[in-house]
Regions:
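An interfacial alpha-helical scaffold signature
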Residues: 1-136
Length: 136
């Protein structure tokens, strides 16, 4: 499969390129993604209350990964007929245990966060930030 060239369109995508070049750690990138808007393809029509949402799952080594994009324009038209926009932090918190995240699938800068990586990230975000009552 030929991967598409990745040219940054959004601030978080510039951060992805920094991480790819080694100027930003994977953990720091995930923290920045938590503050960014993500675009999640859905095979079902998403209602205002979130019902109908059915994310696109990609199998990687027997583990399910939810496909997400960092810009609305990145989703291939034939991947899913619908899309839900959500803040990364909200998405990560709602991601069920046992699921990983595939960011920008099909691009040469795609990112795979395995299920155990998402579990560790979510656990870190469950702890309050020093000096605040905010968990992250």
């Amino acid at each position: 499969m030929t991967l598409l060239a990745f040219v940054a369109e959004t601030e978080i995508e510039h951060q992805i390129l920094k991480a790819r070049g080694g100027a930003l750690s994977g953990d720091a990138l995930l923290r920045r993604m938590a503050d960014a808007d993500l675009f999640i393809p859905s095979t079902g029509e998403v209602q205002t209350d979130g019902s109908g949402f059915s994310p696109v799952l990609v199998d990687q080594g027997g583990a399910p990964f939810v496909a997400v994009f960092t810009a609305m324009s990145r989703q291939p038209k034939d991947m899913a007929p619908y899309m839900m926009q959500m803040n990364g932090r909200q998405f990560f918190r709602r991601l069920p245990a046992g699921y990983g995240v595939m960011v920008n699938p099909g691009y040469d800068a795609q990112i795979l966060v395995p299920p155990h990586g998402m579990a560790a990230f979510k656990q870190d975000h469950a702890r309050p930030v020093a000096g605040t009552s905010d968990p992250g």
